[in-house]
């Protein structure tokens, strides 16, 4: 009960005052994520049809936009965005070393959050269970690589949710179905939902690139296999249907932008002949045709979606030593029975 039926006053008025004060302090300290978390919590104590709920919802949407931009509101001190900081540190390393360095940077900058899930019993035990199931099918080395790849993908979602101040559970592994995260609060806008949704494949792409970098350095075929399968799983997640990540990423795109994604999918199918892309093209084209969107064009979302389609599709072609190259139709690979 949020409102007293007799006096019509808010039941949680004191909690609302406390949360508002904490949110204001966080904003003054330029802690936008902390402010978002407090304002979202305050929404839970307000009737949805109240003016206060509408006002705070608008506040959440505004703060979310600032978090997404990587900048601070005009009253705050300026700071470089994550992309600017990364660009300043970029060096002219070789391909393999660049991928390995990127993985190390990810571990150093996000290591605390990346390892956070392992401190939760539910995540750790379901992770071990999934590892055991996959071990019996593919062996322990591939099973370990697959589970870690899925874990990194899911922690991408966790980090994005934390960045926007959205409460959620840690990953829970389900053998054969990957893993899932339960959101305790909902994104405030299609763009926010898209950032959270595409964060998983983006981190998954990083894991696949790191595995391929290790393969280039060591020559061990198992790393090529982990990289290729990880890329395929993340590409599958880009199917633009709920509740997959692609369905969430598609929400923020205008109709014109959706057709650009369809063109990218079709173009990568022409290059790679990856059968999964046919399904992606069909579903994405159907949504672009059948749905009328009223959202403003989302350039960042379009860039992320297109980047993921192109890179993950290309990585599905990674050759694994000892296995036939993907889509090889030569007579030697087809077999003549001789």
Model regions: which residues?
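Inward-facing hydrophobic residues that define packing positions of alpha-helical scaffold repeats
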Residues: 4, 39-40, 46
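Cys/His-coordinated zinc-binding microdomains
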Residues: 5-11
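Conserved small-residue packing positions in alpha-helical repeats and bundles
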Residues: 23-24, 61
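Hydrophobic transmembrane alpha-helices and their immediate loop junctions
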Residues: 61-338
């Amino acid at each position: 009960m949020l409102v007293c039926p007799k006096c019509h006053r808010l039941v949680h008025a004191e909690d609302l005052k406390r949360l508002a004060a904490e949110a204001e302090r966080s904003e003054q300290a330029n802690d936008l994520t902390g402010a978002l978390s407090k304002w979202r919590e305050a929404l839970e104590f307000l009737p949805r049809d109240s003016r206060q709920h509408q006002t705070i919802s608008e506040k959440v949407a505004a703060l979310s936009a600032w978090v997404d931009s990587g900048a601070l509101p005009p009253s705050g001190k300026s700071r470089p965005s994550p992309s600017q900081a990364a660009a300043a540190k970029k060096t002219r390393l070789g391909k393999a070393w660049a991928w390995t360095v990127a993985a190390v940077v990810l571990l150093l900058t996000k290591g605390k959050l990346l390892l956070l899930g392992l401190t939760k019993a539910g995540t750790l035990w379901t992770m071990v269970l999934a590892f055991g199931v996959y071990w019996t099918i593919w062996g322990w080395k591939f099973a370990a690589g697959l589970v870690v790849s899925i874990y990194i993908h899911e922690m991408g979602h966790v980090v994005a949710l934390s960045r926007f101040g959205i409460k959620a559970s840690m990953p829970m592994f389900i053998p054969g179905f990957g893993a899932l995260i339960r959101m305790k609060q909902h994104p405030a806008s299609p763009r926010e939902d898209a950032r959270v949704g595409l964060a998983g494949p983006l981190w998954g792409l990083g894991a696949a690139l790191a595995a391929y970098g290790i393969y280039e350095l060591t020559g061990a075929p198992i790393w090529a296999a982990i990289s290729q399968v990880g890329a395929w799983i993340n590409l599958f997640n880009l199917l633009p249907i709920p509740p997959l990540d692609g369905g969430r990423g598609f929400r923020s795109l205008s109709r014109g932008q959706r057709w650009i994604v369809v063109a990218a999918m079709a173009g990568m199918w022409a290059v790679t002949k990856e059968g999964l892309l046919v399904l992606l093209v069909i579903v994405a084209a159907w949504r672009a045709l059948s749905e009328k969107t009223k959202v403003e064009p989302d350039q960042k979302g379009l860039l992320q979606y297109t980047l993921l389609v192109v890179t993950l599709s290309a990585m599905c072609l990674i050759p694994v030593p000892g296995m036939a190259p993907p889509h090889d139709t030569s007579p030697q690979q087809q077999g003549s029975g001789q």
